[in-house]
Structures are given as C-alpha cells and as structure tokens.
Amino acid sequence: MATRKDIAREAGVSQGTVSNVLNGRGNVSSEKIRLVESAAAKLGYTINERARILRKGSSNILSVILPNLTFPQYEQFYNSFQKYAESRNYRTYLYTTDDNATREKEIISRLRSDMVAGIAAVSCLSDAPESYSKGGIRENEVLFVERSASSSCHYIGFDYAQAGRYFGRMAAASGPVRLGIVTDILPHSNELAFCQAFTETLREDQRKNLCTIQVTYSRRHHQILQALQSGVPESFYLASFSYASTLKDILANFYPECSPAIHTPSPLFTMPEQHFDKYELNYALLGQEAARMLLENLDSQSWKPRQVLLNADGRRDWTVSVPNGTGHPDKLNLLLLTSPETLAIQSLAKLYTQQTGIRIECTLRSYDEIYSMLSQPESLRNFDIIRLDVTFLSWFADRILTPLEEMDPSIRDVMAQYASGIADNYSSFNGHLYALPFSPSVQILCYRKDLFENTMLKRIYQEQYRATLEPPVTFKDFHQIAAFFTRANNPASPVTYGASLTLGRKSVAASEFMTRYRASSLRLHNADGKLDLNEEIGRQALEQLIDLKPYVHQPTYSWWSDTAAGFSAGEEAMTIIYSNYAQTLVKPSSKVLGKIGVALVPGQNPLLGGGSLGIPRGSVHPQEALRFLRWLCSEPVSSATALLNGIATCQDTYDNMDIQNSYPWMKVVRDSFSKVTDLRPPLRHAEPFNERQFLNIIGATTQEAYQGKLTPEEAIAEVRNEIRRKMD
C-alpha cells in the first residue's frame, strides 16, 4: 500500500507538502497540488482513516443509536441529524438495537474502538447512564434522546405528558365510550409520561373501563390480535405512532366491520394523512437540534446536564370550516397560470372537495394571456379566483379585485403567518388587502459548490486574483469569477462557462438589467413618486451585461426554465434564477445534484417573481372563494403545497425540515425575501404602477444594447424617453 512518503518521492515534494494537500490546506501552490494529486492517483493511494484520527487525537464521527430505522419518526430523526452533522464536517455511524438491552450494551463496548467523538442515543436501558459510563463514555459525550435516562444526563425530547393530557381531555369529552390504550410492556419514559397524563385526565368511569393492551415490538401483531379477541373499543389511544400503524393494519385485515378512531402522537406529516388523529411531533427538528446540542456539549466540555423539551406542532388542522345551511355553490372557477404551481392547487383542492362537496375547476392560461384578460375585466366574470403576477398587482388591484377586508375584516390576521417580505409585496396596494400570497419567488444565486471548494481551483484563483474564491457578493466579483471559470479564458476550468444570462424575452431581459441596477441603487422613483432611472447606474448595469458575453452560453437563454436546465447540465459555474425554477436542479437527471451551493444574489437586493390569488369583483361566490383562499394559503396546506412545488409562503413552512431537506435553498430564499425593496412608488404616492410596461421598456432596450444595436448611453436615453412618453 502506498504511503505519503511514496507520494512525496513520486511528486518530488516534501512529506509536509503531501500532508497539506491531502488534508485540504490551502497553503500550497497550485503546481504542487497538481503534482501531489497526480502522484496519489498514480500510486492508488487511499487515506487510512484510523491512522489519521490517531495523528489528530480526535475524530469527526458521531454515532446515533436507535431502536430501528423502520419507524418513520426515527428515519426523520436520523436523516436530519446526519444532515446537520455533515454540514459541520462530521460523519455519522448508525447502530440499531431493536430495543434489546444486550445488543445495546454490545454496541456501547464498541464505541471507543470505533473512535466516535459523541453519541446520540434513544436508549432501551434501564441503567443507561451507568452503562455508558462503564463503556468509557463521558457525560458530555452522550446525549439521550426521546427517552429520558436521568435528570443528571444531557437530554432532548418533547413534552410527552402534554400530548397525553391533550388526548385525555379529548377522551373525557367523548361520552361513555369504551377506550383502548396500547403501550409497551415495559414502557420507556416518554410512553410512561404519555400514559400517566392520559389516564389521570380521564373521568373515573372511563378509567374503570379502560382496555389496556401491552405489547413488545417483536410480538406486537400477535399481542394486539389476542387482546382484540375480547372486543374492539370504539376509540384507541397509543403512545407510539408505529404501534398505531400496526393497529390500523390489523383492524383493516381482521376487523373490517369495525372503524374505531385511532389517536396517537406522530412524526410531522407535511402531506395530508387521514388514517389517524395525530398530535404531531417534529422528529426532523429533533434530529437537527440533537446534533447541534451534542456538538455544543463536545465543544464546551460541559458537565452541567441540560434537559431540553422542544415545542410540539400538536394537531395541525386540515379541515374546512363551512357554515351550516344551504346556498353553497357546486363549484368554484379559478383562472391560473400554466405552471407547476397549478398541479399543487389541483391536487390539494381534492381534499377541499371531499370535505365541502364544492368542486374546484381550473382554467389555465399563459402569462401574456392572463395579462390580456385582466385588461378586459368583462372576461373575468365567470371566475371566482384569479392568479395575478406580482408585477400586475399594483396596476390591476383596485380596478378588478374585491378588497378582502370588505368581505372579512379579520382577514388581515392571516398576514402574520407569512415569512418576512412576502405579505405586503404580494397582498396589498394603497393600504388595502387585495390578495393572498400563493406562489412567491425571488432571485437566488446558484453556484457549483464542488468547484468553489476544490483545493486546486481555490489556489489557482488565489494566485491569479489575490482573492479568496467564494460566492460573489458584488457583480464585480461575479464577473471576475465568471471569467475564471470559463474554459476559453482558463483551460484549467472543469466547466465551459462561468455564468449564464437570460435575455430571450423582454420581461426576462429586464430582470437581468434590474438585478444589476438595484445592486447599486435602492431607489427607482424620485421624491415626487415619479420614475427616475439613474443614467450612470443604468449605463453601468448594461456594461456589466455586455462585458459578460464571453463567459456565458450563446445564444443566451430565452426563459428561466431554460436557464435552470442549462445549469443542471453541469457546464456552468454560476447562475441567477428565480427560486420557483430551482426544482430542475434537483431532478434525478441533473448533473449538479448534490453539488449545488445557494447564496443571495450579488448586491443583496433581489427581484420578486411569482404571484398571488385574489377575488375578482364579478365573482358570484365571493364568500366561498375567500374561504377556499384562506384554507389554501394557510398552514398546514401551505407546507403541503411547498413540498409539491418548492414554493413556500408561511414561516412555519420555511422551518419545516421535510421541506428544507427536499429543497436545500429554502433558507436562502427566506433571507432573500427579507432583503427585497419594492419597485412600486413610495406609499405616500400610492398610484397604480404599470410594472409590466416598465419592465418591457427596460427589456427591449437591454436586448438592443446587448446585441450592439445601441450603445449603453443610447439605450438608457431611449429608456428615459420611452418612460416619459408612455408612463408619465
């Protein structure tokens, strides 16, 4: 087996240089990095992980000990724990016990030889603290999860007694029904807390008639079937969601004539699930926070025990509140944009129909067709809800939409649920609430994380520009990095182009210009509320676009979907796209899957895209339309929508670990919305602003300047003339 000494001899460098290269340190010249990497590849060198740990004196390995990985709550926990650990440059080892004490003690005996730095354990041991201590594990190195071992140990979990009381109050109000409760024969602390709180909350007569079924994991099917021989209770309460799933299957197969309600704490379900009445606990969040807490304990060497209880999501309500009486319509007609967001509405609307009997019918039109229809209000008379692009809202709101507060004065209360920067930009004009955000999007910078972190490329960039290779904060940096990664300019680049541009249509060309303009100016209107494009900043924005020509694919992309597809093909180092098109980057066919970094756009003042849903003045069923809007645009439906289309509105949705794991750019999207400054005039000059017309003027001249038909100075003069002629 080749050694570092062999590599040093082959490459003609010192062993210290080899060590620096293999450990990813950036203090070696690009030429020596190339020599070492070539020699290592030629000799077939592989890193001896155990030897490296011994040299370092500590490892970057965390172990997770779980009962199993078949229960969905543990799968959610582990995936989230692993993701957080990897983001901090730690690896994870997974061990499963099947709740077998002997097996867990065998695992403990191996932990030191496996050289783990810390352990997160859902332990089945009654003497867990003592067992881990005997295994040479110090108190700050182990974090007990879900099942509390002792008040003298580090612990994180949920308030399981609170869940028990919640279901106990529900049962106490249910009347004289026979209740069943299913728990482990030797319940762990979480189940014990749930069961005690549940039974203490029941009425005396219910406690006397409570059917208690005790099971073990390995024999749960047999034990539940045996207990049901004496009759099936009308309502079941279970401390374990996995046992609830087992009970459901047994009832469906062996007692199809019975349909008892099944109530249980459960992991969080982003998509609707209708088999159980659930009290949801966010195990994905538990995984993240457990990893964070364990690493904090390791860093601080803290011996003072911490006991952390996370808040529960509780019962997330998917139901629709429909007033009693008749007069409800058979259907609601929606005018929507032909786009992926429509699939989410069509899918989730089926739940609304199941509960209310009201069908949701969708008419799909293009961006330009919807604008044309909005310009002719009589064409909207058959629609109850319409989709408006964010650039349409100011121009059309008070002409064609019904102010929502006229129908329901409390509607403004729902604005508090939206993430910062979304509510006002997608809902309001001139102090009135006209729409609810449904599909907001914002510009984000996507870059090849694998290239930006490549030791060789970082060193070459440092040598060439005397700067660190990192995501660009300014467009000057963006241009420099684009040049560096363009192979025609730098033969060492692994990709063909450093960046991309989307200029094929007027509206998208305007976005490319405005992103650069707004990086230097937050103001688009003067003190009198009139459009006032700064000539110098505008000229610089056009010059930046023109100067980027050698470093982008030609011809430039026509639409954002083309831009996303181009980046996912793997031949570009950076791209700026709207967040609603980022799904393309994580498709199975994407060549950049797992290699993507996301950041704020240069200048940190992105543009908005996407749109809202409002109720036209001619709607025949405005109250029912508003009821549907409130249901569709609020939690938990909002999170289900986001899981389907990658577009989030509510703050709770951005905090949803399921969605964060599916769409890794969500945190940057939320931050981007909070940075946006409005294109519309200041509120004191709140007159309708035809943003689409303005962007078309900008886009047309941007295209001409890029094609060389106008100089930047001529193009900006043309823009100012067109604005005066058409918009003043």
What residues fall within each predicted segment?
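Hinge/lid segment of periplasmic solute-binding proteins
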Residues: 390-444, 476, 595-599
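Flexible loop/turn connectors
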Residues: 230-239, 245-323, 329
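C-terminal capping/gating helix-and-loop segments adjacent to ligand/active sites or protein-protein/ligand interfaces
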Residues: 557, 654, 667-723, 727
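N-terminal helix-turn-helix DNA-binding module of bacterial transcription factors
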Residues: 1-58
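Flexible loop/hinge segments that line or gate small-molecule binding clefts
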Residues: 122-166, 264-276
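Glycine-centered hinge/linker elements that transmit conformational signals in sensory
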Residues: 479-484, 516, 520-558
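N-terminal helix-turn-helix/winged-helix DNA-binding helices
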Residues: 1-2, 41-79, 88, 113
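Extracytoplasmic/periplasmic substrate-recognition and gating elements
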Residues: 588-655, 678-687, 700, 713, ...
